[in-house]
Amino acid sequence: MSSDSSSAKSAPSTSIEKSSVNDLHPEIDLERVPRHVAIIMDGNGRWAVSRGLERNAGHREGIESVREIIRACRDYGVECLTLYAFSIENWNRPKGEVSELMRLLEEYLETELAEVMEHRAQVRSIGRLDRLPPSTRRAVEHAVEKTADNDGMKLVFALSYGGRAEIVDAARRLARDAELGKIDAEGLDEKGFASYLYASDIPDPDLLIRTGAEQRISNFLLWQIAYAELHMSQRMWPEFRRGEFEAAVLDYQRRERRFGLTSEQVSSGSARSSSANESDS
């Protein structure tokens, strides 16, 4: 996911469908909706255990939140939504839970593909997908291929994903190209390095949401969230629905995004420096 200098999109590029204007929150400025929202969907298991249910019940209920948040993003004109669906560390969970998560993913992709196509959303995937079970990988690849030509919202699933692993994989590809003489390592800059990341054509997240009442980023999009606004929700993921999403967007719109500039520079309309090494003071 490449660096992008826009702090908020100038106008929604995806149409507002399945929702009337009256359904939208009156305080949300549609001209300043984040272009790219990334979500760490945490708390499924804890939500279930707190209700005396098995952890997998939380994952099943979490699917409803996925559906609702995708529709909310579409309604508000978000251009890209990245969902942290399965981390590379999640392979260490009990085998039964992992198997159920894979089954739910396959089922979701199969049942939701018609709606995805209806709204011309484009499914993408990032992560070490070679570790997925064959049937799961086929389901993911089918959804990606089926929607490749769609021009609506990008829906990115982070699967078998880790931020450090992504950077390592990028470094390996870069090293191979340097060895073959395809690039000049001495002339490499941050933009050049970012082009080796999993989805370098997608702009960096503007807003990172984490549910589950935790205060950490859990190895998610480590390179890309350098200037993202962070919203930590106390809600477990199965409880995070449209209203909570709208609250996160309102929180985002109250922030002043400086990208290393002063407030005075931002107010005067100074352009953000393209350097990702600048610190936000």
Residue ranges, per PLM feature:
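Flexible, compositionally biased loop and terminal segments
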Residues: 1-281
